[in-house]
């Protein structure tokens, strides 16, 4: 599937720094990649294409865009893959409710997402892969799990046995009750009769009336959610990728289960060196989500005349691991900051440029500390100086590292 237009990414002079990120599994900062050799490999879970792109989505993809940019700044070749869950229960339900073909709904929302990512200057993945086009890959992975004895049948549906992976639970570190609760809230079926374990997850669902289905050795049907990402990531990136990324609501069950499926299918461990998660963005005291309908959409803000760089800057004003709530003042504050930065760039001279760039790099490579990074540029912009090359250098660094075009 086609991704979107790649922005220009300038090269910033001066010494780069190695990136450290918070790994959910270990509960601490890890350096990724762990050595000087590349490529740096990253998989980020993509959207289910309906109601794209809300600010929670945008925050996630801007966060991992920073990872991409910092790796490039450090000299790594980056191999980045992102999926699109272009067949799933919520998509089918929305299509039915609105009287639209599910394929048409998916196509429309995917294009809207592409347009938003282009406007926000997010670097596209090398592989932008839909689930529908990946059905053969999913079938292969399920067959591997069968050979490993990790799949069983319940009335024609196939389930992954989580106990087949001794490492299951190691990403989230949640207790059994929490896992069961979250599994039920996030698409799972812990109470289904015939399952060996309440947490066992669906990998192949037999054909249902009125729903899309594909031929397979297991009968006609469609894949479960978690195996889709396992299959796509293994195909394009292999095992022990550097970063598995997504929103914090994916820690369990999605990332836990997709990692276990990959580990059982290959017999290798771990699936990823770092599991990195963007915190939730809410509105009016609640999580922003499609199911709640309390969405602030990037496309609507753009149509209303908001500068996409102000939208991006508003997202960067919050550390990626801190939950926060969108308000109208977020965008107003970001536009004001953007105006100050742009004004500082046009003055011709400024404070020491290399020092500002080094402060920017130091903040961002320390677990994407965007609040400190923005403060460093604020300080530079609000201070007078006589370095004739500072403005051009800072503008270059803000473009390359923060993705903000001044």
From Swiss-Prot:
Positions binding L-cysteinyl-5'-AMP in this chain are 45-48, 60, 83-85, 225, 247-249, 281
Molecular functions (GO terms): ATP binding; cysteine-glucosaminylinositol ligase activity; cysteine-tRNA ligase activity; zinc ion binding
Q: Give GO BP annotations, semicolon-separated.
A: cysteinyl-tRNA aminoacylation; mycothiol biosynthetic process
Q: Position of motif 'ERGGDP' region?
A: 185-190
Record keywords: ATP-binding, Ligase, Metal-binding, Nucleotide-binding, Zinc
- Residue positions binding Zn(2+): 45, 229, 254
EC number, as in UniProt: 6.3.1.13
**CDD domains attached to this UniProt entry:** CysRS_core (cd00672)
Which GO CC annotations does the UniProt entry carry? cytosol
Name the domain of life. Bacteria
User: Motif 'KMSKS' region in this chain: where?
Assistant: 287-291
**Required co-factors:** Zn(2+)
Which reactions is this enzyme annotated as catalysing?
Answer: 1D-myo-inositol 2-amino-2-deoxy-alpha-D-glucopyranoside + L-cysteine + ATP = 1D-myo-inositol 2-(L-cysteinylamino)-2-deoxy-alpha-D-glucopyranoside + AMP + diphosphate + H(+)
Q: Which HAMAP family does the annotation name?
A: MshC
**Name of this protein:** L-cysteine:1D-myo-inositol 2-amino-2-deoxy-alpha-D-glucopyranoside ligase
Q: Which organism is it from?
A: Kribbella flavida (strain DSM 17836 / JCM 10339 / NBRC 14399)
In the UniProt record, the gene name given for this protein reads: mshC
């Amino acid at each position: 599937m086609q991704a979107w237009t790649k922005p220009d990414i300038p090269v910033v002079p001066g010494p780069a720094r190695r990136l450290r990120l918070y790994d959910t599994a270990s509960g601490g900062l890890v350096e990724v990649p762990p050595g000087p050799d590349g490529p740096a490999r990253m998989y980020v879970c993509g959207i289910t294409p309906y109601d794209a792109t809300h600010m929670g989505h945008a925050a996630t993809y801007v966060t991992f865009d920073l990872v991409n940019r910092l790796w490039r700044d450090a000299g790594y070749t980056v191999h980045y893959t992102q999926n699109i869950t272009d067949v799933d229960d919520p998509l089918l339900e929305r299509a039915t409710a609105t009287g639209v073909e599910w394929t048409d709904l998916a196509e429309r929302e995917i294009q809207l997402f592409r347009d938003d990512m282009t406007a926000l200057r997010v670097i596209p993945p090398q592989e932008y892969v839909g689930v529908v086009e990946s059905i053969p890959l999913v079938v292969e992975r399920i067959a591997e799990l069968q050979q490993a004895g990790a799949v069983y049948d319940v009335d024609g549906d196939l389930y992954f046995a989580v106990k087949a992976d001794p490492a299951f639970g190691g990403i989230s570190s949640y207790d059994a009750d929490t896992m069961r609760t979250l599994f039920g809230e996030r698409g799972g079926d812990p109470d289904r009769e015939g399952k060996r374990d309440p947490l066992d997850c669906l990998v192949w669902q037999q054909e249902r009336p009125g729903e899309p289905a594909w031929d397979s050795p297991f009968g006609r049907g469609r894949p479960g959610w978690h195996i889709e990402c396992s299959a796509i990531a293994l195909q394009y990136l292999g095992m022990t990728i550097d970063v598995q990324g997504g929103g914090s609501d994916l820690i369990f069950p999605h990332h836990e289960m997709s990692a276990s499926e990959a580990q059982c299918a290959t017999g290798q461990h771990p699936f990823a060196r770092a599991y990195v998660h963007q915190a939730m963005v809410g509105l009016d005291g609640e999580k922003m989500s499609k199911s709640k309908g309390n969405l602030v959409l990037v496309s609507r803000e753009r149509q209303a005349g908001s500068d996409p760089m102000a939208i991006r800057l508003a997202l960067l004003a919050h550390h990626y691991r801190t939950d926060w709530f969108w308000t109208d003042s977020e965008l107003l504050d970001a536009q004001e900051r953007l105006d100050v930065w742009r004004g500082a760039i046009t003055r011709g001279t400024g404070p020491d440029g290399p020092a500002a760039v080094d402060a920017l790099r130091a903040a961002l490579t320390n677990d994407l500390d965007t609040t400190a990074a923005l403060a460093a540029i604020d300080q530079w912009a609000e201070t007078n100086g006589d370095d004739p090359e500072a403005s051009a250098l800072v503008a270059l660094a803000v473009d390359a590292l923060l993705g903000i075009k001044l």
